[in-house]
Amino acid sequence: MKISVLGSGSTGNSVLVSTENTTVLVDAGLSAKQILLRLAEIGINYDDLDGVLITHEHSDHAGGLRVLKRTLECPVFISEKTKHAYLAPKNSKNGEKESKLRNDAIGDCSVKIESDREFRIGDIDFEPFSVPHDAADNFGFVARNRGYRIATLMDFGHFTPFINEKLKGCDAIVVESNHSIDMLRACPVYSWELKQRISSETGHLSNEDLSVWLSAEYDGSARDIVLSHLSQKANDPFLAKITAESALNARGPLFRSDTRITLSDKGKPTEWISF
C-alpha cells in the first residue's frame, strides 16, 4: 500500500491511496485540472481510479468534484449527511443552479457510506472515525491492506481519546498542522470571527496542538508523518516541521529513530510513501 498527498493547504486538499489492485482518490478539493495533472505526475491514469472518497463537504475538500466527475466514471463514496450538505451549498451565488449541477454529477454514481462503520473499496479496508470539525459529518480514517495501516485526518480542531486510540499502530499518518497560534493571532487578513473559528475546538489543529500530541500521546509506531493543510497566511512550512520534529526529538529514546516528518505542499504532490 502507498499514499501520496496530491496537494494540501487552506485552498484545496486531495490524497491518493493505492495498492497493486486498487486506487482511491480521497477528497477533491483541488481543481479538476490540477487533480488530473497531479495524478499523471505520480504515474496514475485517472481511468484506474476505483473511487473518490469524500470526507466532508467543505470546498477545500470537495470543490473540484463536480467538474472532475465529467472525466471520471468511478463511483463517489460519501455519507448521507455529507452528500446532503454538498448538494445544498451555502456560499454559492447561484445556489439552486449549483445544487442541480452537483446532483447531476454524483446523483447516480454515489455509494452511501457511514462515518462510523467500516467499508471496503477494492482490496482496501477503510475504518472511518468522527473528528471534531464544523462540517456535517466529517471523518478521518485508517486505510488497511495486508497488515499495513495508513491514517488520514486533515480537518479537526483537537485530539480526542477516541482519535488517539484509532491512530495507535499506524505505519503512516497524514495529519493537520494548520497554523501557528502566534501567526494566526497576528494575521492581518483574517477577521476576528475567522480567527475564532480556526482556533476553536471544531476548527483546525495548530502546530502547537500537534506538538503536544506528539510529545504526550503518539505511540511512536509510524515510520512517516505527513503534515497537511498548512495555512498559507497563518503558518510557515519550516516552523511547522521544526515544531513537530522538536516534539519527537524530546522523546527520542521512546520512539523509533527512523520516524520521518514530511511536509505536504499546496502546489505539488508528495513523493509516494510505500509499504
Language-model segments: which ranges?
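Active-site neighborhood of phospho(di)ester-bond hydrolases with catalytic His/Asp-centered motifs
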Residues: 26-29, 49-57, 77-80, 151-154, ...
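Metal-dependent catalytic neighborhoods of phosphoester/phosphodiester hydrolases
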Residues: 63-72, 87-95, 236-242
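Metallo-beta-lactamase
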Residues: 80-140, 144-147
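Short helix-capping segments at alpha-helix termini
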Residues: 43-45, 94-105, 218-220, 249-256
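Cap/insert and terminal regions of metallo-dependent hydrolase folds
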Residues: 161-264
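Structured catalytic core of nucleotide-sugar glycosyltransferases
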Residues: 5-14, 57-65, 83, 126-129
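Conserved beta-strand hairpin/beta-sheet module of binuclear metal-dependent hydrolase folds
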Residues: 1-42, 139-155, 172
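Active-site metal-binding motif and surrounding structural segment of the metallo-beta-lactamase
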Residues: 33-81
